[in-house]
């Protein structure tokens, strides 16, 4: 008799995705981040659900409802900090996952890659709206500054901003709609992640060598289920350590002050995971130019597959491209640092140079270097 997991309509979907899935035998720990992102999403949805039971999306009570969660709700402080720091873990896994894709040429699976870029945008939008909900100083001013950027769009800009605000400033209507979107988007992200997996399983996983691995596949279970469980345990260990020992390490002290439209904080800055994009935005003196650079800093990922000029897929055997990849990583870390600094000398010029280097590396230097490496191999 055939095993039930292979014949049952529902179980065979799970079976073909997580049990009998043929996987390359040589994928490293860099391939763990997909499953870790799934775990992060589940943690965020569950903690978010319990927070939503106690949160009120009204400008008068939002801040106090968060205080109430931390003080009066059983383990409310734990749920709140798991959710806040879970977002940071989510973005760490996201950045490493995207970095892995860039390094090993996973972007050659076009559909999977493009849905991944769409997922990145969706997660960033969700995180931004979630940051507004506690209604602290940085929540309010962050929302004001970022939504105001849309006014740079010619002709419809100012109308668009007022439409998003639901009035003439960030107020009750804005908070309520941000809460609604923040609640629904994670479920849309989960659906998109399903489509992401669907397209990935059409082609099969890439591997570190970038070569076809059809001749050497192993079943996902037990090999990679065990490997993923190790990753999940390390993720949970890191997250719980962060939550229990220094829950406010990655937050902004300004957000413990209730929102006040009459008092602007000295340095308005987003959460750490948006600082690189914020630095690119600030490095251009023109408003519309800055907004375009901000969007393009992420959208540029969708162009990467078309800039692949190498005869080899992975960077595993391409030392020059490897050097450039790590320069790109260092550049992004520099941008992250600059994004958190005040707008003054020397930070302005460092930010501008780092922004130029970011776009130059991806659009010009890396494709040319790949062609040079092809010539070295006389291909």
From Swiss-Prot:
InterPro entries in the cross-refs: Cyt_b/b6_C, Cyt_b/b6_C_sf, Cyt_b/b6_N, Cytb/b6-like_sf, Cytochrome_b, Cytochrome_b_C_euk/bac, Cytochrome_b_N_euk/bac, Di-haem_cyt_TM
Pfam families found in the cross-reference section: Cytochrom_B_C, Cytochrome_B
Keywords from the named record: Electron transport, Heme, Iron, Membrane, Metal-binding, Mitochondrion, Mitochondrion inner membrane, Respiratory chain, Transmembrane, Transmembrane helix, Transport, Ubiquinone
PROSITE patterns (UniProt xref): CYTB_CTER (PS51003), CYTB_NTER (PS51002)
One annotated Gene Ontology cellular component of this protein: mitochondrial inner membrane
Membrane topology: Multi-pass membrane protein
GO function terms (MF aspect): metal ion binding; ubiquinol-cytochrome-c reductase activity
Keyword Isomerase part of the UniProt annotation: no
Binding site for heme b b566: 97, 196
Subcellular location: Mitochondrion inner membrane
Keyword 4Fe-4S: no
Cofactor(s), by name: heme b
An individual GO BP term: mitochondrial electron transport, ubiquinol to cytochrome c
UniProt binding sites for a ubiquinone: 201
TM spans (from-to): 33-53, 77-98, 113-133, 178-198, 226-246, 288-308, 320-340, 347-367
Residues involved in heme b b562 binding: 83, 182
Cofactor, free-text remark: Binds 2 heme b groups non-covalently.
Family membership noted in the UniProt record: Belongs to the cytochrome b family.
UniProt miscellaneous comment: Heme 1 (or BL or b562) is low-potential and absorbs at about 562 nm, and heme 2 (or BH or b566) is high-potential and absorbs at about 566 nm.
Quaternary structure note: The cytochrome bc1 complex contains 11 subunits: 3 respiratory subunits (MT-CYB, CYC1 and UQCRFS1), 2 core proteins (UQCRC1 and UQCRC2) and 6 low-molecular weight proteins (UQCRH/QCR6, UQCRB/QCR7, UQCRQ/QCR8, UQCR10/QCR9, UQCR11/QCR10 and a cleavage product of UQCRFS1). This cytochrome bc1 complex then forms a dimer.
Summary of the function given for this chain in its UniProt record: Component of the ubiquinol-cytochrome c reductase complex (complex III or cytochrome b-c1 complex) that is part of the mitochondrial respiratory chain. The b-c1 complex mediates electron transfer from ubiquinol to cytochrome c. Contributes to the generation of a proton gradient across the mitochondrial membrane that is then used for ATP synthesis.
Protein name: Cytochrome b
The organism of origin for this protein: Sorex granarius
Gene behind the chain: MT-CYB
């Amino acid at each position: 008799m055939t095993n039930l997991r292979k014949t049952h309509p529902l179980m065979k979907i799970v079976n073909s995705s997580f049990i009998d899935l043929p996987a390359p035998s040589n994928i490293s720990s860099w391939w763990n981040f997909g499953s870790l992102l799934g775990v992060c999403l589940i943690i965020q949805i569950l903690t978010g659900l319990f927070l939503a039971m106690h949160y009120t999306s009204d400008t008068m009570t939002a801040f106090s409802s968060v205080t109430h969660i931390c003080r009066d709700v059983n383990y409310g402080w734990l749920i709140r900090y798991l959710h806040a720091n879970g977002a940071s873990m989510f973005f760490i896994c996201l950045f490493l996952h995207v970095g892995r894709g860039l390094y090993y040429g996973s972007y050659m699976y076009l559909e999977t890659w493009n849905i991944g870029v769409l997922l990145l945008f969706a997660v960033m939008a969700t995180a931004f709206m979630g940051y507004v909900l506690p209604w602290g100083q940085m929540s309010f001013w962050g929302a004001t500054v970022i939504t105001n950027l849309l006014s740079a769009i010619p002709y419809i800009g100012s109308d668009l901003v007022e439409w998003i605000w639901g009035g003439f400033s960030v107020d009750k209507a804005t908070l309520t709609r941000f809460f609604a979107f923040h609640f629904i988007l994670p479920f849309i992200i989960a659906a998109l992640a399903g489509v992401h997996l669907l397209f990935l399983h059409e082609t099969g996983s890439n591997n570190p060598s970038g070569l076809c691995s059809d001749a050497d596949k192993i079943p996902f279970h037990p090999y990679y289920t065990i490997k993923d469980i190790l990753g999940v345990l390390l993720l949970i260990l890191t997250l719980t350590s962060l939550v229990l020992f220094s829950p406010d390490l990655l937050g902004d002290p300004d957000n413990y002050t209730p929102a006040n439209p009459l008092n602007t904080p000295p340095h308005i800055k987003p959460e750490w995971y948006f600082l690189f994009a914020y630095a690119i935005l600030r490095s251009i003196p023109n408003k519309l130019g800055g907004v375009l650079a901000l969007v393009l800093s992420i959208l540029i990922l969708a162009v990467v597959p078309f800039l692949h000029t190498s005869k080899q897929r992975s960077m595993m055997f391409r030392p020059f491209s490897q050097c450039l990849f790590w320069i790109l990583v260092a550049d992004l870390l520099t941008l992250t640092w600059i994004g958190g600094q005040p707008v003054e000398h020397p930070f302005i010029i460092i930010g501008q140079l780092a922004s130029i280097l970011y776009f130059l590396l991806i659009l010009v230097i890396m494709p040319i270097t790949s062609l040079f490496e092809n010539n070295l191999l006389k291909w």
